[in-house]
Swiss-Prot record:
GO biological process: blood coagulation
UniProt protein name: Fibrinogen alpha chain
Subcellular localization: Secreted
Organism of origin: Anas platyrhynchos
Keywords annotated in UniProt: Blood coagulation, Coiled coil, Disulfide bond, Hemostasis, Pyrrolidone carboxylic acid, Secreted
Functional note: Cleaved by the protease thrombin to yield monomers which, together with fibrinogen beta (FGB) and fibrinogen gamma (FGG), polymerize to form an insoluble fibrin matrix. Fibrin has a major function in hemostasis as one of the primary components of blood clots.
């Protein structure tokens, strides 16, 4: 799951 990794990297936990 690369999408989740990139999402958390941006700083968006619950968006």
């Amino acid at each position: 799951q690369d999408g989740k990794s990139s999402f958390q990297k941006e700083g968006g936990g619950v968006r």
